[in-house]
Amino acid sequence: EKPTRFPARAEWVTDTTLATTLGNEDASLSTIEHLVAALRGMGIDNCTVEVSGPELPIMDGSAGSFVYLIQQAGVRAQARMRRRIVIRRPIEVRDGNRWVRVLPSRDFKVSVEIDYPHPVIGRQELESWVISPERFAREIAPARTFGFARDIGLLQRQGLALGGRFDNFVLFGEEGPVN
């Protein structure tokens, strides 16, 4: 059987309910966030990922396991220059009260703000960081994913989050962390 192929590009996103899913009419792949973060964080922009199921494994609940595997495999420069996207003016996209803004910069910098309707998470902000592969591996990749107890049933009925354990994500109940 010939494998189904699709690129990890925004136009291939088919669902973002509690996880990001890529796909086409033949197949889909869910929970791609940690792998995509590890690839970007480690400076990889061209690779092939082969999987045997509909969801990437959650492993330790972070991008750290993927970073470790990338470091063990090694990264090789390619003979061809990569295409770069150059941001020349601010770009902003809004969807209700959610937004993303991209600004011109020589470096890959990230500023993040979350305003989540949960008493423990609430509003948090991370000031602008320059992200190098070393900094990503050390300070960002180990951050574990979180989820809500109220969502576990829905995810598992969809065949997702089957690898979820108390040691690979932070679980929140209505009042705060459960684990």
Language-model segments: residues:
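C-terminal regulatory domains involved in ligand/effector binding and gene-expression control
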Residues: 1-45, 50-179
